[in-house]
Each structure stands twice: as C-alpha cells, then as structure tokens.
C-alpha cells in the first residue's frame, strides 16, 4: 500500500497538467495560462492508422528471345554506271554591233599664208678619213700533247643470288549471291487527260509608224575675209664705224745680263774597292727515304636489288568546259581632232656689236724698281 501511495504521488507530481491546475486553484487570481487551459481545451487530433505500404509485385523475368543469326551475304558488285554525256550548251546568238553615228564634217578654217623665212645654210665640214689600223697576224694555238689512256681495273664478279619463290595462295572463289524474288510493281492508275482550254485569239494590233522628221539644213558658215599680206620687214643696216689705228709699243733697249763667274772644278775622289766575301761551301740536303706505295683495297660491289614498281593508276580525263563566246564591245565614234593654227615666229632684230679695243702692251719691269 505504501508503495502504491508513493507511486501515485510521484505520478501526480510528475504530470505537468496537475501541477498547473493545483497552482491555478491555490492562487486567488487565475493566471492567463490556467484560464486558457481550463476554458479552451485543445481538441486531440486522432491518429490515423498506418496504412501498409504498397508493394509493387515483381514481374517474372521473361527470357530474351535470341535473334536468329542471318547468314552473311557477300556484297554484290555494283554495276558500272555508263557515262552520261554532258549536254551541249546552246550557242549564244551574236549581238549585232551598233552602227556608228556619223558626225558631220566640220570645215577647217583656212589660215592666211605668211611669207617663208629662208633658213641660213650651214658651212659644210670636210670629211675626215678614218686611219687604217694595221692587221694583227693570227697566233696559232699550240697543240696539247695527247695523254695515254689508263686501263680501268676489272671488278671481281659476284655470283647471282636467286630470288626465293613465294608460296602460291589458292584463289578465293566468290560466293554466289542468291537471287531474290522479283516482286511485281503495282501499276499506277491512269489519270485521264484533261483537255487544255483554247485561248481566244487576240486581234493583231497594227504597229504605229513613227512620223518622219524633216531634215534640218545645216547653216552655211560665213566666209572669212582674206587678210592682207604682211609686208617684208627689211633688216636695218648697221652704221660703219671708223677704223681705230693700232698703237705701236715704244721700243725698250735690251738690257745685257751679267755673266756669272765659273766655279772651279772639284778633284775626283778615288774609288774604294769593296772587300770580297769568302764563299761558303754548299751543304747538300739529305735525301729522304722513299715510302713504298700501299695499294688501296678494292671494295666488293653489292648487287643491285630491283625496286618494286608502284601500280600505275589510270589518268582520269578532265571534262572540257564549253567555251563562252566573247561579246565584242561596241566601238565609240571617234571625235575629229581640231588642229590649232600655228602662230608664225617674228624674227628678233640683231643688235650691232661693239668693236673690241686692242689691249695695251705690257712693258717689261726694270730691275731695281718697286
């Protein structure tokens, strides 16, 4: 019994709801928490029973159907497609050249003729004969001496190495391709031909003729009046100047040069003979011993192995492109060149040249004067 009382007291004290209720009853003013608990008790949400999990039923494993192995068919050889000739392009029609428009002839203006001025003739220079060069005698080339022919050494012959025969492989016969059953193609239904409606014929429209334009007459140019001829301009004659007599230089007396005294001749120095050097005896050079020539060993020649020739591929001819005809360019009409009138040159009058006065002769300087 004692144990039961202890367990009940312990259970009451351990529950938080009973403790809150006791505190609310003992206290004079009710607390907000106690009021809420007493007035608005929360409804308990009923727990739904746990539904068993839906297990997906396992499907039985079906054995995979094995595909039957198809026999390997050898690849059929494709038939050779015949070469399709290229269609020739139609020739472009030649475009006619446009006719050149003829320009009216422009009459040239006639210029007045001026008198011709004669050109002064140059004096002829005498011809200078070319000096003849002496002939050089031909020098004969010396003939080179003929060298004796050196016989070539014979190489040792090697035996030929026979090529090993390659084993022959049997030819693989190609398997015959089984003939497939020919399936008849279904015939297409015939479509009835629909007759084309005939178009109504249009009346021919007469071409309008262009009205003829009256020819316009060219106005005649008025004739230029003839210019009077220019009178010849006479060259003015130069006035003759009086001759100026040449001044004769006064004769200066000749001054004799003083004779220099002769220097006495110096006596000749006697010749000093050079002492002769004693002759040194000639030292003979020692002769070196001759080294015997060692013959070079001849190398054996390796037989040439023929190279395998690469297979030649047939050349594929390039297709020729059709030539496009050249379209000629229309030529433009040439405009006539208008020549400019040449202006005559007026000769300049020559000025009279002044005569040169003769230079005065220079007098010789007298020694002793500044």
Swiss-Prot record:
Sequence repeats lie at residues 43-47, 49-53, 54-58, 60-64, 65-69, 71-75, 76-80, 82-86, 87-91, 93-97, 98-102, 104-108, 109-113, 115-119, 120-124, 126-130, 131-135, 137-141, 142-146, 148-152, 153-157, 159-163, 164-168, 175-179, 186-190, 192-196, 197-201, 203-207, 214-218, 219-223, 225-229, 231-235, 236-240, 242-246, 247-251, 253-257, 258-262, 264-268, 270-274, 275-279, 281-285, 286-290, 292-296, 303-307, 314-318, 319-323, 325-329, 330-334, 336-340, 344-348, 355-359, 361-365. Disruption phenotype: Slower germination and root growth, delayed growth and flowering. Keywords: Cell wall, Developmental protein, Repeat, Secreted, Signal. Residues 65-370 are annotated as: Disordered. Residues 1-34 form the signal peptide. GO terms for biological process: positive regulation of seed germination; post-embryonic development; regulation of photoperiodism, flowering. The keyword Signal applies. It comes from the Eukaryota. Residues 65-223, 232-262, 271-296, 306-334 have a biased composition (Basic and acidic residues). Residues 43-365 are annotated as: 52 X 5 AA tandem repeat of P-[DEGQ]-[AEFLIV]-[QPT]-K. GO terms for cellular component: extracellular region; plant-type cell wall. It is found in: Secreted, Cell wall. Positive regulator of germination and plant growth. PANTHER family: MUCIN-2, PROTEIN PELPK1-RELATED. This is Protein PELPK1. The gene is PELPK1.
């Amino acid at each position: 019994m004692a144990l039961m009382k202890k367990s009940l007291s312990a259970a009451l004290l351990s529950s938080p709801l009973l403790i809150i209720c006791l505190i609310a009853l003992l206290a004079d003013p009710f607390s907000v928490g106690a009021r809420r608990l007493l007035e608005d008790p929360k409804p308990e949400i009923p727990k739904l029973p746990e539904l068993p999990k839906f297990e997906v039923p396992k499907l039985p494993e079906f054995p995979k159907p094995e595909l039957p192995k198809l026999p390997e068919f050898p690849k059929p050889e494709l038939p050779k497609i015949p070469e399709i000739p290229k269609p020739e392009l139609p020739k472009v029609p030649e475009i006619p050249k446009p006719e050149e428009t003829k320009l009216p002839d422009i009459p040239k203006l006639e210029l007045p003729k001026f008198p011709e001025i004669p050109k002064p003739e140059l004096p002829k220079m005498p011809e200078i004969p070319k000096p003849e060069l002496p002939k050089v005698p031909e020098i004969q080339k010396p003939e080179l001496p003929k060298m004796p022919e050196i016989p070539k050494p014979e190489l040792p012959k090697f035996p030929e190495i026979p090529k090993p025969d390659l084993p022959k492989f049997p030819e693989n016969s190609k398997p015959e391709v089984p003939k497939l059953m020919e399936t008849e193609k279904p015939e297409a239904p015939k479509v009835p031909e629909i007759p084309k409606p005939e178009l109504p014929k249009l009346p021919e429209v007469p071409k309008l003729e262009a009205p003829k334009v009256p020819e316009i007459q060219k106005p005649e140019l008025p004739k230029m009046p003839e210019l009077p001829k220019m009178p010849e301009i006479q060259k003015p004659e130069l006035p003759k100047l009086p001759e100026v007599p040449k001044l004769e230089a006064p004769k200066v007396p000749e001054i004799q040069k003083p004779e220099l005294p002769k220097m006495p001749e110096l006596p000749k120095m006697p010749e000093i003979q050079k002492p002769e050097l004693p002759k040194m005896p000639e030292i003979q050079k020692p002769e070196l011993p001759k080294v015997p020539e060692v013959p070079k060993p001849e190398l054996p020649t390796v037989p040439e192995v023929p190279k395998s020739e690469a297979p030649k591929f047939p050349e594929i001819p390039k297709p020729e492109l059709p030539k496009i005809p050249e379209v000629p360019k229309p030529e433009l009409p040439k405009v006539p060149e208008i020549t400019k009138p040449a202006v005559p040159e007026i000769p300049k009058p020559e000025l009279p040249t002044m005569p040169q006065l003769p230079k005065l002769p220079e007098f010789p300087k007298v020694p002793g004067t500044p």
